[in-house]
Amino acid sequence: MLKRDMNIADYDADLFAAIQEETVRQEEHIELIASENYTSPRVMEAQGSQLTNKYAEGYPGKRYYGGCEYVDKVETLAIERACELFGAEYANVQPHSGSQANNAVYMALLNAGDTVLGMSLAHGGHLTHGSPVNFSGKLYNIIPYGIDENGQIDYEEMEALAVEHKPKMIIGGFSAYSQVCDWARMREIADKVGAYFFVDMAHVAGLIAAGVYPNPVPHAHVVTTTTHKTLAGPRGGLILSNEGEDLYKKLNSAVFPGGQGGPLMHVIAGKAVAFKEALEPEFKEYQARVVANAKAMVAEFLARGYNIVSGSTENHLFLVDLIDKDITGKEADAALGSANITVNKNSVPNDPRSPFVTSGIRIGSPSITRRGFTEEDAKNLAGWMCDILDNMGDESVIEATKAKVLEICKRLPVYA
């Protein structure tokens, strides 16, 4: 018989210790990975609920199993809130991840071998936008576009490539681009060649929900996102559209039964909570601070003589190009990590080094903002990072910085 007082600590000491260690790491490290965030205890409560027990293949009102009347309510809430949040007519909340959502779009709209125009991974795109090592690059004919010498998306190149190659789909969106995307211009290019326009807004979904970054939903045929990152919900995916029932049916079929079986109802409940949180005024204030903190960090890096790809940021992230500093991204990642500052190494445009080494680091502000960092805190943090990068290998600088990190983490806990 199951008892409510069963717990991991008493039953599985090894696993409990690992969880506790990760909890301490999150509290005592400054998190600057742009794709990470801290979700709320309410979301975690939903994910730890009895909904994890329920199998619910199908969609609300059209399930293959009985006993789904209450999980139907949960999924319907998530759908309605997602549509309200992003101004969409259609939402599918079942994808287990952003990559699964993207896969569903490919399967719904394309045939194997079709031509797709997507942002080059080396210029800020995502694996699922056509990388040769990903399903998208293996199954489809990918034509990459990139950024110009000023670090801006080259729309003239995009249009020329579209006219030349006649893609069936054009992808907007990114994993490492710090500027504003012109969704309307991209749709014009897609319409010119009769292509679908698909946007992956995973990185900026929270900013879009708050109105501090342009919304692609009115422009794209279909939009996908993750539900974590800037949206600060559970790890999962979401598909949105305003383009009519025929497309909605194709998308639903591509998710189930095309790509997945039973949905994760406990995660969908977490999504419903996160969407409700994102509709609150406080969420809009948070997202404005996310952008302000990223800008404050960029200003300090520039003042200290560092090169920022695109020269600025208009969202939550930016890339520091370390080529001129003769520091690899891998080395910078390790040095900053020694001071409890977590970043990720990242390729920069025209990077001479391999993706396993790289010449840059990607920095994001969602997590530090979530725990209460001000613009002054963000500026100081960027300065500490420059101190380490200016003095690579100097353990005294690392130890002094680590002490500052531990102090501010204690002052601004993730979960108070």
From Swiss-Prot:
<feature type="site" description="Plays an important role in substrate specificity">
    <location>
        <position position="228"/>
    </location>
</feature>
<comment type="pathway">
    <text>One-carbon metabolism; tetrahydrofolate interconversion.</text>
</comment>
<keyword id="KW-0554">One-carbon metabolism</keyword>
<keyword id="KW-0808">Transferase</keyword>
<dbReference type="GO" id="GO:0004372">
    <property type="term" value="F:glycine hydroxymethyltransferase activity"/>
</dbReference>
<keyword id="KW-0963">Cytoplasm</keyword>
<dbReference type="InterPro" id="IPR049943">
    <property type="entry name" value="Ser_HO-MeTrfase-like"/>
</dbReference>
<dbReference type="Pfam" id="PF00464">
    <property type="entry name" value="SHMT"/>
</dbReference>
<comment type="function">
    <text>Catalyzes the reversible interconversion of serine and glycine with tetrahydrofolate (THF) serving as the one-carbon carrier. This reaction serves as the major source of one-carbon groups required for the biosynthesis of purines, thymidylate, methionine, and other important biomolecules. Also exhibits THF-independent aldolase activity toward beta-hydroxyamino acids, producing glycine and aldehydes, via a retro-aldol mechanism.</text>
</comment>
<keyword id="KW-0028">Amino-acid biosynthesis</keyword>
<dbReference type="InterPro" id="IPR015422">
    <property type="entry name" value="PyrdxlP-dep_Trfase_small"/>
</dbReference>
<feature type="modified residue" description="N6-(pyridoxal phosphate)lysine">
    <location>
        <position position="229"/>
    </location>
</feature>
<feature type="binding site">
    <location>
        <position position="245"/>
    </location>
    <ligand>
        <name>(6S)-5,6,7,8-tetrahydrofolate</name>
    </ligand>
</feature>
<dbReference type="InterPro" id="IPR019798">
    <property type="entry name" value="Ser_HO-MeTrfase_PLP_BS"/>
</dbReference>
<dbReference type="GO" id="GO:0019264">
    <property type="term" value="P:glycine biosynthetic process from serine"/>
</dbReference>
<dbReference type="GO" id="GO:0030170">
    <property type="term" value="F:pyridoxal phosphate binding"/>
</dbReference>
<comment type="similarity">
    <text>Belongs to the SHMT family.</text>
</comment>
<feature type="binding site">
    <location>
        <position position="121"/>
    </location>
    <ligand>
        <name>(6S)-5,6,7,8-tetrahydrofolate</name>
    </ligand>
</feature>
<dbReference type="InterPro" id="IPR015424">
    <property type="entry name" value="PyrdxlP-dep_Trfase"/>
</dbReference>
<comment type="subunit">
    <text>Homodimer.</text>
</comment>
<protein>
    <recommendedName>
        <fullName>Serine hydroxymethyltransferase</fullName>
        <ecNumber>2.1.2.1</ecNumber>
    </recommendedName>
</protein>
<feature type="binding site">
    <location>
        <begin position="125"/>
        <end position="127"/>
    </location>
    <ligand>
        <name>(6S)-5,6,7,8-tetrahydrofolate</name>
    </ligand>
</feature>
<comment type="pathway">
    <text>Amino-acid biosynthesis; glycine biosynthesis; glycine from L-serine: step 1/1.</text>
</comment>
<keyword id="KW-0663">Pyridoxal phosphate</keyword>
<dbReference type="InterPro" id="IPR039429">
    <property type="entry name" value="SHMT-like_dom"/>
</dbReference>
<dbReference type="InterPro" id="IPR015421">
    <property type="entry name" value="PyrdxlP-dep_Trfase_major"/>
</dbReference>
<dbReference type="GO" id="GO:0005829">
    <property type="term" value="C:cytosol"/>
</dbReference>
<dbReference type="InterPro" id="IPR001085">
    <property type="entry name" value="Ser_HO-MeTrfase"/>
</dbReference>
<dbReference type="GO" id="GO:0035999">
    <property type="term" value="P:tetrahydrofolate interconversion"/>
</dbReference>
<feature type="binding site">
    <location>
        <begin position="354"/>
        <end position="356"/>
    </location>
    <ligand>
        <name>(6S)-5,6,7,8-tetrahydrofolate</name>
    </ligand>
</feature>
